[in-house]
Amino acid sequence: MERVRDVSELPKAHLHLHFTGSMRPTTLLELADKHGVRLPETLTEALGRGESPKLRATDERGWFRFQRLYDAARSCLQTPEDIQRLVREAAEEDLRDGSGWLEIQVDPTSYAPRLGGLIPALEIILDAVETTVRDTGIGMRVLVAANRMKHPLDARTLARLAVRYAERGVVGFGLSNDERRGMARDFDRAFAIARDGGLLSAPHGGELTGPASVRDCLDDLEADRIGHGVRAAEDPRLLKRLADRQVTCEVCPASNVALGVYEKPEDVPLRRLFEAGVPMALGADDPLLFGSRLAAQYEIAREHHGFTDAELAELARQSVRGSAAPEEVKGKLLAGVDDWLVA
């Protein structure tokens, strides 16, 4: 009988974790009380029961409800101390799940009004990351993400800012929010600015919309990675293209089910992507709202898709290779994966 190893001890990289969505439920409730923020009852009741709220974002009404909960949680982050707490706790949760490298995704414009402006907000976040790296030992960097529901000119401003802070811990540029709003090509100039500044291109695509949105990310934004990308499984030619170019898809199985992209964990096409040779980096997306963190995604691959420990190890390797980690860090993590397999 094959030995079943603990996936929380498997060294890995975490490439798809949103800033506010990384918060512990207990932290959210404490910060809401601290700042006098009244959270939606659906959120407080679910978290009070130790559950995640019931979500489904496959239509605009469902997405609006999801965004409302997310915005309410974000409103509880009001001081540099709140930011530091969130970043440190996100790192602690990742370390507990075996992550040695975390790229946390944030749109600093969302925090600017409470933190003194756009530049102070990003600097506070980067300072928190630097302190957390020093205190915990985790490798951690920031991916700055534009909001596709805002004007493309805003994205260009954000891209320039991201490049300016590339030496302070920004490693990539993304595009998030509802894929059904705004065309990828509208943001091509922002991504060109980011690429010219040496940042990874990691836009969202292939989650709420089909394979066409993944193609748009490749064609218009020259994506190095795709946030989600799971709907590429519906197009064999696109799968081959992703595999040939070794574009990493940041697949978030629990999130896909929670938002109604797929009905059940076994419906998420992990096996199809894996066998097509598409690199994947499993991610937790928004644990606050979806109720599961990084190691749980590997458990889904094992329990619902029959991934062996050797295959789980390869998933971990793919996450490391797809990261912006320095080669020395990648080498250490990859060696750790090999050790996990022979232990």
From Swiss-Prot:
Pfam families: A_deaminase. SUPFAM superfamilies: Metallo-dependent hydrolases. One of its GO terms (molecular function) is deaminase activity. InterPro entries: A/AMP_deam_AS, A_deaminase_dom, Ado/ade_deaminase, Metal_Hydrolase. Its cofactor is Zn(2+). Disulfide bonds: none annotated. Putative nucleoside deaminase. May catalyze the hydrolytic deamination of adenosine or some similar substrate and play a role in purine metabolism. This is Putative adenosine/adenine deaminase. GO terms for biological process: nucleotide metabolic process; purine ribonucleoside monophosphate biosynthetic process. PROSITE patterns: A_DEAMINASE. Its EC number is 3.5.4.-. Binds 1 zinc ion per subunit. The active site is at E207. Substrate binds at H18, D286. Gene3D superfamilies: Metal-dependent hydrolases. Keywords: Hydrolase, Metal-binding, Nucleotide metabolism, Zinc. It comes from the Bacteria. Zn(2+) binds at H16, H18, H204, D285.
